[in-house]
């Protein structure tokens, strides 16, 4: 009996092998022995990676933002971020509440009516931090985001490469990874 479906079977097998070779997104590790007091202070959001539709639509117009991380009264962290939006500086503060081992936090976004879990995956405290955020409850589909925090507005090449490797390990594609352009607006340093 002839096997007219043999070419289709070959394509199907190649497709299955391609799927099997595509790395599945993995959960980010957590910074061992996270020291919250060393994490405090000024950070610049230098890189982002995400699978969310809003990010993919807006990624070309995003720019670097400045964040101040300070202890909160309840033991969590207040993260006050200043960024450029429609040619004006905008500031928002998030309360990160402890949510598990040190370095794990959660916050609720009043804007999106969603809850997010944030993990500090890796940091040297003085130069960079790699964060992983997952939306866990909300009206829309779950979304994932990796963030590169840098203590300066110009992270070193090896820090950028570390972030790219981190983002890829979480399943993000090149299209979903962006290094945010530096801007002079809203970045002034107050003493």
Curated annotation (Swiss-Prot):
Signal sequence extent: 1-24
Keywords per UniProt: Cytoplasm, Disulfide bond, Endoplasmic reticulum, Fatty acid biosynthesis, Fatty acid metabolism, Glycoprotein, Golgi apparatus, Isomerase, Lipid biosynthesis, Lipid metabolism, Mast cell degranulation, Membrane, Nucleus, Prostaglandin biosynthesis, Prostaglandin metabolism, Secreted, Signal, Transport
Glycosylation sites per record: 51, 78
Disulfide feature: 89-186
Main function: Catalyzes the conversion of PGH2 to PGD2, a prostaglandin involved in smooth muscle contraction/relaxation and a potent inhibitor of platelet aggregation. Involved in a variety of CNS functions, such as sedation, NREM sleep and PGE2-induced allodynia, and may have an anti-apoptotic role in oligodendrocytes. Binds small non-substrate lipophilic molecules, including biliverdin, bilirubin, retinal, retinoic acid and thyroid hormone, and may act as a scavenger for harmful hydrophobic molecules and as a secretory retinoid and thyroid hormone transporter.
Protein family: Belongs to the calycin superfamily. Lipocalin family.
Protein name (database record): Prostaglandin-H2 D-isomerase
Gene: PTGDS
